Design a protein with these regions (language model features):
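Extended amphipathic, helix-rich lipid-handling scaffolds
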Residues: 1-11, 22-30, 34-82, 105-179
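Short acidic-glycine loop/turn motifs at beta-strand connectors
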Residues: 28, 96-97
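Secretory-pathway-linked proteins and extracytosolic
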Residues: 101-103
Length: 190
């Protein structure tokens, strides 16, 4: 069925969102979700340091149950706000037999269409808070004109200090960049 301005509160470690508009169809075996939303607020305290305001969200996704497990496939999602525009696709799978209560296995890839370099840290997960905090202080200016990112592996091991456990990659072309590696050093301009 169709829904408008739907809100889901965060609970039990799961994220929440408000302002969702789209359609949903499915049953206990699986289903499909389509979003065409404006003015979405995404809350995931366990993942991001603050709620993310999304001006435009368009997505197609599907899910299916296999025994005790769940798989969610994002066919395509496009998110945009004043700070960035990204596209993402990929799969998340629960790991119900994991001995460590893993948050799941993921294989996501995305493209950064545009982003304000000073805002990039706002979109990085809590698992790399130290890197995110450094970027907050070090990135002084710039526009990301083209970028890509990948996240693949068992999220229990994130941020993947052992490369055999997973991959997290962010690459970008930055125009008008200004970076201050260390407070005692002069800033570098590009």
């Amino acid at each position: 069925g169709r829904f408008e301005e739907l809100g889901v509160s965060p609970a039990g470690g799961l994220p929440g969102a408000s302002g969702l508009t789209g359609s949903l169809e499915g049953d206990e075996r699986g289903g499909k979700l389509r979003l065409e939303s404006r003015g979405v607020l995404f809350e995931a305290a366990g993942i991001f340091r603050a709620p993310l305001a999304i001006e435009s969200l368009e997505a197609r996704a599907a899910w299916k149950r296999e025994g005790p497990g769940l798989e969610v496939r994002i066919e395509e999602a496009r998110l945009a706000n004043a700070g960035a525009e990204v596209t993402v696709s990929g799969t998340w799978r629960s790991l119900p037999d994991s001995p460590v209560n893993s948050p799941g296995w993921v294989d996501l890839a995305g493209r950064v269409v545009r982003a304000k370099a000073v805002a990039v840290a706002d979109y990085l997960p809590n698992g790399i808070a130290q890197t995110r905090d450094w970027l907050d202080k070090a990135v002084l200016a710039g526009e990301v004109s083209d970028g890509r990112f990948e996240l693949k592996g068992d999220l229990w091991h994130f941020p993947f200090r052992d490369a055999s456990k997973g991959r997290f990659l962010v690459e970008a072309a930055i125009d008008g960049g200004r970076l201050q590696y260390h407070p005692a050093w002069p800033a570098v301009d590009r």
